Design a protein with these regions (language model features):
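Compositionally biased alpha-helical segments
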Residues: 1-180
Length: 181
């Protein structure tokens, strides 16, 4: 695989910001590690993980923040669905891709081989929570739980920004970055 180093920075566990270059892979899945050089010409390549840094930014492209979050394991592709709702999860330190930075909340995504998940960090809290979207089968038919709609409505109510127009758009929202933004 060819290298594609772009200008960026990493934030260490002690909060130090180190400028350099990150091998930008235009990831389809959230990266578990990145390659970082302080100097583009003859810099030593460091492999950094969620254990060693809290954030990395590829300038003009993407920012990823490390968070320890529950990651739902329930499948959403029809061929993989089961009769029972899969509520299993694991807790892991992962790099969440920052999609929106707001005054009150930030929106993140996490994609792996199973599915995409969206997370909200309510700035009154310290940990993001997953916006819940589940699928299962019932008598061979697909059943979808759109719990993320109630989660978004509740958050808007707590902040006093809920109105008829907002509720209307939430009631039609699909589990996609475009709608959840």
């Amino acid at each position: 695989a060819q290298s594609n180093y772009k200008e960026g920075n990493v934030v260490t566990n002690t909060g130090t910001i180190i400028k350099g270059f990150i091998n930008y892979r235009e990831w389809h899945k959230n990266p578990e590690q990145i390659q970082f050089k302080r100097d583009l010409k003859n810099g030593e390549v460091q492999t950094l993980t969620a254990d060693s840094i809290t954030r990395f930014t590829i300038t003009g492209y993407e920012t990823y923040d490390r968070h320890i979050v529950p990651v739902s394991m329930g499948e959403i592709s029809f061929e993989s669905l089961k009769e029972a709702i899969d509520t299993s999860f694991f807790i892991k330190a992962v790099f969440l891709k920052k999609m929106v930075t707001g005054d009150r909340v930030d929106l993140y995504s996490y994609t792996d081989e199973i599915k995409i998940r969206f997370y909200v960090l309510d700035k009154r809290q310290t940990l993001p929570f997953e916006l819940v979207y589940r699928k299962s089968l019932s008598d061979g038919r697909e059943i979808t739980q759109l719990l993320f709609r109630q989660q978004l409505s509740r958050l808007a109510l707590e902040y006093g920004i809920s109105d008829a127009s907002f509720e209307e758009s939430v009631s039609r929202a699909t589990y996609s970055g475009k709608d959840i933004r």
